[in-house]
Amino acid sequence: MKWTNKQYVDLMTYNHPERPMFSELFGPIIGLSDEWRSQGATEDMIAMKAFAFDYVPYYNLGNLDTIHRPKEIVLEDTATRYVGIDHFGRRVRMDKRTSTIPLPETFPVETMDDWLKIKHMFEYDPCRISEDEIAKAKALQDQGVLIKSEILGGFDILRELMGEENCCIAFYEDPELIVDILKTISETNVKVLSQISKKLTIDQLSVHEDMAGKTGPMIGPNLVSEFIVPYYLQAWELVKDAGTKLFCQDSDGNMNPVIDAFIEGGINVFYPCEPAGNMDIVALRKKYGHKIAFRGGIDKHVIRRTKEEIKQELLYKMQPCMMEGGIVFGLDHRIPNGTSLENYIYYIRTAREILGLPPFEECEPSWGRMAF
């Protein structure tokens, strides 16, 4: 079912929603489509449309990413392998059989001088937003499309520029570099979001971090509060004052130790809430109540197991305390390889039954990616 921006915002702010959403946030991982075709899947199933998922269409307003990027250089590109130099000047490599994101082998920033060479890519430029783009977004918003703007992650961009190890060390040994990077990006955020907020209220501010593994985040709550929270608040307080209600963070892994710090920074929606990283949406709901909302939270690994295990996962995650709003139920990541089509269909049917939704076969085909 296609939702409107108002329905989605009402759901995520606990404003008397009709029901929770049931979605597929990401879709199948590489290779699963071929597995399912061999098991009799239709092309509508491969495209996720057959399962009548809930979704809200969205539009990203304003360019808060890097600009004036140098041309990427391809060093090797075969059927199974890609090697190149990306827009940051990093040497990157990707195995096309298992991945869609090239991984960096080198990083451009070790010192302040390194940063100054690429700083212009993060600074404000009028090309980042235009009156025509704002007008287009306003027209879409009036039609029910969710309008979002996305700032760079306060940790994520540092990791992209410096690598995880050097980034974490720099918080202690070169805080001036960290501060200058975040200050530069923040100034750009404020200028662009100020222009937007004079003409319309965005529905959601988004940020991507991916800053944690199974055992915890790569920096703790003290560093988040000292460096990341002020960066967040400069953007969030601006759009919040203009009427924006949602500030959504995307981060894998175990974020439990830093949730309170990020709430301090304005975050009120977390996803994908990875159970393998000890992110339990039921426990989090009981701890935080209506203070935060979630997308995801259903263990993607369970759907490769027995049907009874699938049912128990759904009964636990979809218990009555989770039905008050503030939740988009869905797998915590892409559907993993080895998930049988039979199991996936059982998962869909069981979830829809628990939620009181009609069988997907009786509904209009629908799906929209919900990773925003």
Which ranges hold each PLM region?
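Acidic surface patches and DE-rich sequence motifs
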Residues: 77, 86
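A structural signal for short, hydrophobic beta-strand segments that form beta-sheets
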Residues: 70-76, 97-99
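Segments that shape or occlude catalytic/ligand-binding pockets
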Residues: 32-70
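Active-site loop segments of alpha/beta catalytic cores
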Residues: 1-39, 83-85, 94-95, 112-372
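N-acyltransferase acceptor-side catalytic subdomain
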Residues: 5, 22, 46-48, 57, ...
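Extended Gly/Ser/Thr-rich low-complexity repeat segments
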Residues: 93-106
